[in-house]
Amino acid sequence: MASHGNSATFSLGSRQVKRLGYGAMQLAGPSVFGPPRDRHVALTVLREAISLGVNHIDTSDFYGPHVTNQIIREALHPYPDDLAIVTKIGARRGEDASWLPAFSPAELKQAVHDNLRNLGLDVLDVVNLRVMFGDGHGPHEGSIEESFSVLAELQQQGLVKHIGLSNVTANQVAEARKIAEIVCVQNEYNIAHRQDDALIDALAGEGIAYVPFFPLGGFTPLQSSTLSGVAASLNATPMQVALAWLLQRSANILLIPGTSSVTHLRENMAAGDLQLSDEVLAVLNGMNA
């Protein structure tokens, strides 16, 4: 299993980032829409993340929309030299807070410029193409050549340093890599949902980061009970155990747990110090059986 202390790093494009980062989605209002309940708390969470050593923040201009990026800029600009801000394009928000695909060339280009403006940047570190085929929940097969080529063109223009993918299949990863190199893949993955095991291993062999989201998503009651029991035996929270398992799963996994609470932020960061024994790992791995 991979080493994972809070000092452990992995490459994300041209940067080495710590494996425990921060996901900014929850800084917006309910349903990731509108302003936060308490803007001061949102600013405090971001500044505390940096003080705890976070140098990888995941965001998007469709969080809010615009709200989360504007909060990041207010809290942290001018940004620390070692901070990697990763954003994503390919979706937009309806007036009812719905999530809608935004895959046309014009929409993709506008999204990059919106991210640049609201983050206060001249160049974006990493932009992921968020794929929303099917019902938008979970990857669905389909060609991404046209939309990914638009992102690759923006990279060639110098607006984006590195590019990646989100919510994709292994076939779509292969299709994209024929067009341009990617530095990361973001998909749902956790102890109970391990459909990307082969993809993670393949990406590790290529030096490409894998960034899982929803570390506690989709657990059955039995799986949740098992995880809670393990956590109690370790004097840890279920989230800490879930994050520690991911860190030990593979060295190319980068985490972006999100929260709007300073207390939960500190708990999440402490997961980097939680070492799971072989016996504990066997119990957790059995949850996927």
Name what the model sees in each region.
Residues M1-L83:
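N-terminal binding-site loop/beta-alpha segment at the start of enzyme catalytic domains
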Residues H4, M132-A289:
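Beta/alpha (TIM)-barrel catalytic core signal, keyed to glycine-rich beta->alpha loops juxtaposed to Asp/Glu
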Residues R73-A84, R117-G120, R177-K178, I200-G205:
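Acidic (Asp/Glu)-rich catalytic clusters
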Residues R117-H137:
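Active-site groove signature of glycoside hydrolases
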